[in-house]
Curated annotation (Swiss-Prot):
Motif (Nuclear localization signal): 1072-1078
Listed InterPro entries: BRCT_dom (IPR001357), BRCT_dom_sf (IPR036420), DNA/RNA_pol_sf (IPR043502), DNA_pol_Y-fam_lit_finger_sf (IPR036775), DNA_pol_Y-fam_little_finger (IPR017961), HUWE1/Rev1_UBM (IPR025527), IMS_HHH_1 (IPR053848), REV1 (IPR012112)
Main location: nucleus
Domain (UmuC) ranges: 417-651
Family: Belongs to the DNA polymerase type-Y family.
Organism, as annotated: Mus musculus
Annotated protein name in UniProt: DNA repair protein REV1
Region (Disordered) residue spans: 253-323, 1035-1109
GO cellular component, one term: nucleus
A Pfam family per the record: REV1_C
All residue ranges annotated as the BRCT domain in the record: 44-131
Length: 1249
């Protein structure tokens, strides 16, 4: 192989100029090594390795970092990059044949030479420790097959799997037939068999290299790892996996030919299976997160072949590189960032390296671990038994923080919560086997260099930095600064090469680093400027998982009342433990911390308090590596001095708002009354702040948490050039969503597609390599017909939303899919069998959030007619089912009506305007006056599924309906002054007395609202049972008589009942009513007068002009009554309001006040009201949304579509800005139903953009 061949093949990769950048870098690394050596030397230092310069190639034990430290302490030199002229010894455990040939007689020494020389106190001869000796001409060697030259084209994709299999088989057969392998005079298949020939070069010919960070790496490019692949806390040695049992050369020589052939076949299969398992495990490994310029190896058998002649060099960035648990993947040694998002393993690679993904996954696993413990608990806790034994032999004296002795008071059996939190979790795990780094500033990050990175063309870090500073001050209204006035002020000149500070984020930093101003989340480049001695260590996900599991297993040995907060912290209720063991909280906390430290070698701090809030605050005082018990008598003084930012739920936005009120501490916050806080922050948040600032917290330690959503989002490395790439990526992300839904055992119904798009004016190239930069966030949401976990369905819906966005593909910087409205995978809410339970739960009397309303709304496929019924069922809080029976009542409405109790009380009555009910209070949501429909409308299967007591009540009401005296006038009583409120003109009331007092006029009355008969389809009416036809006819006759009795009554007015959550400003009371023009001889202007979602002018054009065409006799009553007052005004209902139309010949009529939202009429007032509602409440109530829907439909009735359009668009902007996804759901609900009304009224819909 020509020496210059590699240089020719990699002339464009930017690494060939050794005389410039690399020479300066090597010199800088050597100077840094000498500086560190001077600082590290102490009494144990020596000069054993004076004049020795080592270079570590691949995996070694001790690791490369440990060898570096040993050379530093004992006078040697450590070279990150091999130099033929300067390096004296190459340290390696194993090398493939290609590298052995390239060394050409260089000294390759085992790492034991260094260790044993230090033990002996002198420099030992390296001859006995040579890894390979130069073979003589008489020495036999393996007959290696020639491998493909790097210049040769790689195999086609269709033949890769076959060629890999043939290659493995060929290698094994060659190994099996060889008689001996000389390595240092010893026969060793492990050292010179498979590892020499089955090299990574062969795999690369089968799976050609991909672009890494935009640069195509040649197949024989050396990627030198210097031992950074071995984790001292238990990295796997897959060499053992790759060696079949009984494959020793000596053992094979003793076998006869038959046995040898059998063993060859078995070894072939074993080796192939083991190799495949290793490669699959490597691909799935979560420990492969590394910097963009680093790729690591785990197995010495899979090193890439390396030229050690100065042409090849490592991509390790600096001498501070340390051990890692990176696992080799099949695709170019697990490149830190796959070349393109369109690659099939891009998503899996990204999540295998994502710290946040691992943290969230671990939390779910630990939560499930705790739940499993509780389900399988036998009540036996080994930890408690140990504590009891320890308690008998211990004194009640403990040493306090001040060093004095104090007698612990006897434990009191009061509520006690402990917050266990590991100190600097990622750092503690990373250095637990690194005593040389303890006590030094350490940070866990993906960058292990000097804190700088090359400046890429087109990037403008200073502009991005200024933009984010402006955004912190001005919020989302911040503009992008003019790029022409900004220069790269954070760039530096390093060896003549422009560079910028590294944007790698610090995941965790030690307390020593925090003392100089370094914080978690800070960019490593800036942190390196604050602390030049900052040591960077890599992520060790495997070890972190082990430590987290060990901590939770320790806690579980004492109690199962555990709330998994994160992988490194947990809340436990220790009240029972203290009562059983008779220990004080301080004693138990000390024992717990000692046990955790013994098992994990990591320190944990414990905060103790009477509730979760105080325990968390106590932990902050206990850190680092301590414990603190916040006594009840100390709470008041302690809490007053705490900053409000220490309270849960107080973020930057709320902090700035509190600061504007002059509040910085909890003591300041205590000066405000609850009314003031609720006015400023809303009812829930105001009450929360009022309690938390006083140390009050009634939250229990929750072991189970309901999962609200499943999502997969990627905002790193997203760069598309064609729409097909983006579409393929969305389909791949949909498959990831399917895997996560299946793992969670859930299905989702609502999909949200989130796209990050480069903000206009932002730099095309981001300051952080592969980052998203300055972006706008765009989201689209769709609700599926049924809950699903199918990637095919999710992908199709996602692509439809994506196509509607019409984005510039090259500007996409992030993609995410979120699934809401989760249901268990073994249930199906869309089937009829599950509908009764879901609906009856809505009317169980307990408060419900808007999510329940949406779940009810989407319980059936929303065809046009069914959509009407669902909407009415959601809006009509009285669920007047019979009013929709004449309009072909849907099964859903019947189920709703049949699943509730008919009982009515004075606090559960509501007013209805134009078919819409206004809620009375937040406490009576959906628990209002629910009437039972006629017997013919009740589904018997639903009735039989109801509880016995409820079913008996409904049967009694039905019996009373059949025996009800017709034509007798009923009056509401029992103080239900608002129970029988005026209904819109054209509505018929069926009044049904309670079965207990069927003949008593003072009994309770259930009122069922029927539409005007002009709304009834004659064919539908004719198809009804004769009994129901008689019942309806009697009701309309009764309506006619009531109209005659109330013709001369004067209407009285009351204000519409207001929702307390929407009553943010007092509504104006209007007693004067506007006059309408004479409507003689003309149909009504709006169908909302009769029924909300039906237009008589469109559906029944002849209903008003000639009712005789429908049904003789019965329609005459309707024709006479349709233009007369309808409502019955009782003396016991002084607040009732008469909404009646004029008889023919009258010149005017009364109507409700102008459309208002909780009293707000002007658009400016409505905007203020909506903004306060949306920004102060995180979970809107059903009645709030329904009241907004009612306001919008009132605007439609008044034909004020201009204001309606402004209101809808303003709500859309506000709700999309909210971080709560439920607000988007609320807006979609409002918009869907407004569009239905518009479509029925005007034959068109609003165009909302």
């Amino acid at each position: 192989m020509r020496r210059g061949g590699w240089r020719k093949r990699t002339e464009n990769d930017g690494w060939e100029k050794w005389g410039g950048y690399m020479a300066a870098k090597v010199q800088k690394l050597e100077e840094q090594f000498r500086t560190d050596a001077a600082n590290q030397k102490d009494g144990t230092a020596s000069a054993i390795f004076s004049g020795v310069a080592i270079y570590v190639n691949g995996y070694t034990d001790p690791s490369a970092e440990e060898l570096r430290n040993l050379m530093m302490l004992h006078g040697g030199q450590y070279h990150v990059y091999y130099s033929r002229s300067k390096t004296t010894h190459i340290i390696a455990t194993n090398l493939p044949n290609a590298k052995i040939k390239e060394l050409k007689g260089e000294k390759v020494i085992r790492p034991e030479w260094i260790v044993e020389s230090i033990k002996a106190g002198r420099l030992l001869s390296s001859a006995p420790y040579q890894l390979y000796t130069k073979p003589s001409a008489a020495q036999k060697s393996l007959n290696f097959n020639p491998v493909c030259k790097p210049e040769d084209p790689g195999p086609g994709p269709s033949n890769r799997a076959k060629q890999l299999n043939n290659r493995v088989n060929h290698i094994i057969k060659k190994i099996e037939t060889e008689s001996e392998v000389k390595a240092n005079g010893l026969s060793s298949w492990n050292e010179d068999g498979v590892n020499d020939d089955f090299s990574f070069e062969d795999l690369e010919h089968t799976f050609p290299g991909r672009k890494q960070n935009g640069v195509m790496h040649p197949r024989d490019t050396a990627v030198i790892f210097n031992g950074h692949t071995h984790s001292s806390n238990g990295a796997l040695k897959t060499q053992d996996c790759l060696v079949p049992v009984g494959n020793s050369v000596a053992s094979r020589l003793s076998l006869d030919s038959t046995q040898e052939e059998k063993r060859a076949e078995k070894s072939n299969a074993d080796f192939r299976d083991c190799t495949v398992q290793h490669l699959q495990h490597s691909t799935r490994s979560a420990d492969a997160l590394r910097s963009p310029h680093r790729t690591n190896s785990l197995s010495p058998s899979l090193h890439s072949n390396t030229k050690i002649n100065g042409a090849h060099h490592s991509t390790v960035q600096g001498p501070s590189s340390t051990k890692s648990t990176s696992v080799l993947t099949l695709s170019k040694v697990a490149p830190s960032v796959p070349s393109k998002p369109s690659d099939c393993n891009f998503i899996s690679d990204f999540y295998s390296r994502s710290r946040l993904h691992h943290i969230s996954t671990w939390k779910c696993e630990l939560t499930e671990f705790v739940n499993t413990l509780q389900r399988q608990s036998s009540g036996i806790f080994p930890g408690r038994e140990k504590l009891k034994k320890v308690k008998t032999g211990r004194s009640s004296l403990v040493v306090t923080d001040t060093g004095t002795m104090s007698v612990l008071s006897s434990p009191r059996h009061q509520s006690c919560v402990m917050h266990v939190d590991m100190d600097c979790f990622f750092v503690s795990v990373g250095i637990r086997n690194r005593p040389d780094l303890k006590g030094k500033p350490v940070a866990v990050t993906s960058n292990r260099g000097t804190g700088t990175a090359p400046l890429r063309p087109g990037a403008n870090p200073q502009l991005e930095w200024q933009y984010y500073q402006n955004r912190a001050l001005r919020g989302k209204a911040a503009d992008i600064p003019d790029s022409s006035v900004w220069e790269n002020q954070d760039s530096t000149q390093t060896n003549g090469i422009d560079s910028v500070l590294s944007k790698a984020e610090i995941a965790s930093c030690s307390y020593e680093a925090r003392q100089v101003g370094i914080k978690n989340g800070m960019f490593f480049g800036y942190a390196k400027q604050l602390c030049p001695n900052l040591q960077a260590v890599p992520y060790d996900f495997h070890a972190c998982r082990e430590v987290a599991q060990a901590m939770y297993e320790t806690l579980a040995s004492y109690t199962h009342s555990i709330e998994a907060v994160s992988c490194d912290e947990a809340l436990i209720d220790v009240t029972d433990i203290l009562a059983e063991t008779k220990l004080s909280p301080e004693e138990f906390a000390a024992a717990l911390r000692i046990e955790i430290k013994d098992k994990t070698k990591c320190a944990a701090s414990v905060g103790i308090g009477s509730n979760i809030l105080l325990a968390r605050m106590a932990t902050k005082k206990a850190k680092p590596d301590g414990q603190y018990h916040l006594q009840p008598d100390e709470v008041d003084d302690f809490i007053r001095g705490q900053l409000v930012t220490n309270l849960p739920g107080v973020g930057r936005s709320m902090e700035s708002k509190l600061a504007s009120l002059g509040i910085k501490t909890c003591g300041d916050l205590q000066c405000l009354t609850m009314a003031k806080l609720q006015k400023e922050f809303g009812p829930k948040t105001g009450q929360m702040l009022y309690r938390f600032c006083r140390g009050l917290d009634d939250r229990p330690v929750r072991t189970e948490k309901e999962r609200k959503s499943v999502s997969a989002e990627i905002n790193y490395g997203i760069r598309f050039t064609q729409p097909k790439e983006a579409e393929a990526f969305l389909l791949s992300l949909s498959e990831e969503i399917q895997r996560r839904l299946e793992a969670a055992g859930m299905k989702g119904k609502r999909l949200t597609l989130k796209i990050m798009v480069r903000k206009p004016g932002a730099p095309i190239e981001t300051a952080k390599f592969g980052g998203h930069g300055i972006c706008d966030n765009i989201a689209r949401t769709v609700t599926l017909d049924q809950a699903t976990d199918s990637a095919k369905i999710i992908g199709k819906a996602t692509l439809n939303m994506f196509h509607t966005m019409k984005l510039n593909i090259s500007d996409m910087r992030g993609v995410g899919i979120q699934v809401n409205q989760l249901v268990p995978a073994n249930s199906n809410l869309s089937t009829c069998s599950s509908r009764p339970s879901a609906q009856s739960s809505l009317f169980s009397g307990r408060p419900h959030s808007v999510r329940d309303l949406f779940q009810l709304q989407k319980a059936k496929k929303p065809t046009e007619e069914e959509h009407k019924e669902v909407f009415l069922a959601a809006v009509d809080l009285e669920v007047s089912s019979t009013s929709r029976a004449c309009g072909l009542l849907s099964p859903l409405s019947a189920h709703l009506a049949a699943s509730v109790s008919p009982d009515t009380n004075s606090g559960e009555c509501s007013r209805k305007w134009n078919g819409l009910h206004s809620p009375v209070s937040g406490q009576s949501r959906l628990n209002l006056s629910i009437e039972v429909p006629s017997p013919s409308q009740i589904d018997q299967s639903v009735l039989e599924a109801l509880p016995l007591d409820l079913r008996e009540q409904i049967e009694q009401v039905c019996a009373a309906q059949q025996g009800e005296p017709r034509g007798k006038k009923k009056e509401p009583v029992n103080g239900c002054s608002s129970g029988v409120l005026p209904h819109p003109v054209g509505t018929v009331l069926l009044q049904i007395p309670e079965p207990q007092e069927p003949c008593n006029s003072d009994s309770k009355i259930s009122v069922i609202a029927l539409p005007a008969f002009s709304q009834v389809d004659p064919d539908v009416f004719a198809a009804l049972p004769a009994e129901l036809q008689k019942e309806l006819k009697a009701a309309y006759d009764q309506r006619q008589r009531q109209g005659e009795d109330t013709t001369h009554q004067q209407p009285t007015s009351t204000s519409v009942p207001k929702n307390p959550l929407l009553q943010l400003k007092p509504p104006a009371m209007k007693d004067k009513r506007n006059k309408r023009k004479n409507l003689i001889g003309s149909p009504r202007k709006s169908p909302l007068k009769n029924k909300l979602l039906s237009s008589p002018a469109k559906t029944l054009p002849g209903a008003y002009g000639s009712p005789q065409k429908l049904m003789d006799g019965f329609l005459q009553h309707e024709g006479m009554a349709s233009e007369r007052p309808l409502e019955e005004v009782s003396a016991s209902t002084p607040g009732a309001q008469d909404l009646s139309s004029l008889l023919p010949g009258q010149s005017s009529c009364f109507r409700p006040a102008a459309p208002n939202l909780a009293g707000a009429v002007e658009f400016s007032d409505v905007k203020t009201l909506l903004k306060e509602w949306i920004t102060t409440i995180s979970d809107p109530m059903e009645e709030d949304i329904l009241q907004v829907v009612r306001y919008c439909t009132d605007l439609i009735e008044e034909k004020d579509l201009e204001k309606l359009d402004l209101v809808i668009k303003y709500m859309k902007r506000l709700m999309q800005q909210s971080v709560e996804s439920v607000w988007n759901m609320a807006f979609d609900f409002i918009l869907d139903n407004v569009q239905v009304v518009l479509q029925q009224t005007y034959g068109s819909t609003l165009k909302v953009t």
